[in-house]
Regions:
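Accessible peptide chain termini
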Residues: 1-2, 207
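Low-complexity, Pro/Thr/Ser/Gly/Ala-rich linker/spacer regions in secreted
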Residues: 473-475
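Bacterial N-terminal signal peptides
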Residues: 2-11
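Sequence signature of WD/YWTD-type beta-propeller architectures
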Residues: 16-395, 401-407, 419-439, 444-456, ...
Length: 475
């Protein structure tokens, strides 16, 4: 393969850059870019079947060569720059037979060290405060691949999952408020969904507080999500694409908006997007027709204010260029102080009003909810079992203790034990976590009524479900 030859010499390529001064700031930033001869859709670990590399270039510098920073690797991807822009995390694969692992190098490509040493594929790393990293771990290949978000020390020690249910969780980026931005399926179901989408979620670095950030459109998927300076989230949103199609349109969620909005035209195909400077982002855009076997992704600037594409920043006739990130310092994200109690094996969950549901007429479920049945998801095959039932008060409130780190979902029962509404997504609580919800798929734009729930007036302790001596859990 061509990467064997690349490993024998320092690779410098003359490239074509934009010379349009209107597109470029006074000091164009350096970029880290992933280049690949072939980009494949599908499983995260199989995106680059012929290999890939990370190069550094000066955006907007005409005819300046690029420098290969990952010589000796069959494939490298997912560059993530440290807040001081001195170091870079990336996913690397020394040979085609080895799994992806997380590596770190200096910004110029020297001083490489391996962070993770897993038997599974580890990709999409991001820097966390206080010498930690987060990444996506993929435990299998093909259509049934399962992925979870992991956190580890910067040397790879104390690696542990922070997501526990189905959904194919993938790390997208770290928000300035200290939460991790994830993408995963919606709903978070272990059963195939014909109209399933991939949506954005937020989670704390200790795995608590998982919440849907925005629900995606039916059949859509999100990739390459990152935060802009004004707090907007920008990402690539694809519709009903085929199994061999890659990319989609640019979309964003602005602060205070309830829904995402497409900001590019149908027919344009983008593979990645990342903040550049001011109102500009750097995008990877397909430059040839989608049905062309020689289609490539090239780098362009895109103005989010005018919603117009700028001139090409970089073009290589041999490789697609994508996942471009600016090699620039940025503010350090806030550190989240965990309040979990890892000596406990349970978590608590309170629902304020199970009647609240944005899917029901008038926003409220009809009928009388008498109890809630709790189901747990266990084992590699995803078998579910009933953990128990608990009472629901007349105001729709209930309060539970459940085993920690166990995916659970709920079924609302009437006075005869008939299911009124069944939750599709699996959720969990971390050890010692107190987790609350406003209702049953309630409207996120509305706050709960300012009242003390009846369940807390009648019971000062939660109802235990699935708690027994065999699992060692105690309320």
């Amino acid at each position: 393969m061509f990467f064997l030859a690349l490993g024998l010499l320092t690779f410098l390529v003359q490239a074509e850059f934009s010379q349009d001064g209107k597109d470029l700031p006074a000091a164009a930033p350096r970029l880290l870019v992933v280049q690949a001869a072939e980009v494949a859709a599908g499983n995260l670990a199989d995106r680059f079947p012929q290999g890939s590399r990370i190069v550094q270039l000066q955006s907007g510098a005409p005819a300046q060569p690029v420098v290969n920073l990952t010589q000796g690797f069959f494939a490298a991807a997912d560059p993530s720059v440290s807040p001081d822009a001195a170091r870079v995390l990336f996913a690397g694969r020394k040979t085609a037979r080895e799994p992806w692992q997380i590596w770190e190098m200096k910004a110029g490509g020297s001083g490489k060290r391996q962070v993770t040493h897993e038997h599974a594929d580890c990709l999409q790393p991001v820097y966390l405060p206080r010498n930690q990293v987060a990444y996506t771990r993929v435990d299998s290949h093909g259509a049934g691949a399962a992925s979870q978000a992991y956190v580890a020390d910067s040397d790879g020690g104390h690696a542990h999952p922070i997501t526990f249910g189905p959904g194919g969780f993938q790390v997208e980026s770290l928000l300035r408020d200290g939460r991790i931005l994830l993408s995963a399926s919606w709903p978070l179901s272990n059963a195939p969904q014909a109209d399933a989408a991939r949506a954005l979620y937020v989670i704390r670095t200790d795995g608590s507080g998982l919440n849907l950030f925005r629900q995606g459109a039916s059949g859509s998927a999100v990739d390459s999500a990152s935060e802009l300076s004004d707090g907007s989230l920008i990402f690539v949103q694809s519709g009903s694409r085929g199994p061999h199609e890659w990319g989609g349109q640019l979309a964003w969620v602005q602060p205070g908006r309830l829904h995402s909005q497409l900001i590019t035209q149908p027919g344009e195909v983008f593979a990645s997007v990342h903040a550049l400077d001011g109102d500009r982002v750097v995008v990877s855009r397909k430059t040839l027709p989608a049905n062309s076997s020689s289609a490539r992704f090239d780098l362009y600037s895109f103005n989010t204010s005018t919603r117009k594409l700028g001139s090409a920043l970089y073009h290589d006739p041999q490789y697609s260029s994508l996942q471009a990130v600016a090699l620039e310092p940025r503010p350090t994200a806030r550190y989240y102080w965990t309040i979990l109690h890892y000596d406990l094996k349970t978590g608590r969950l309170i629902c304020l009003d199970a009647y609240q549901s944005q899917d029901a007429p008038g926003g409220r479920l009809a009928g009388t909810i008498a109890a809630v049945r709790v189901l747990g998801l266990e084992g590699e095959q995803g078998g579910q079992r009933v953990l128990g039932t608990a009472p629901v008060e007349s105001d729709g409130s209930f309060y539970l203790t459940v085993p920690a780190d166990l995916p659970v979902r709920f079924e609302l029962l009437d006075t005869k034990g008939k299911v009124l509404r069944a939750q599709q997504s699996w959720v969990w609580t971390r050890p010692g976590e107190d987790r609350g919800c406003g209702g049953c798929h309630e409207d996120k734009a509305q706050v709960p009524a300012n009242r003390w729930p009846l369940i807390l007036k009648r019971f000062d302790v939660p109802t235990p479900v699935g708690i027994n001596a065999s699992n060692g859990a105690k309320p």
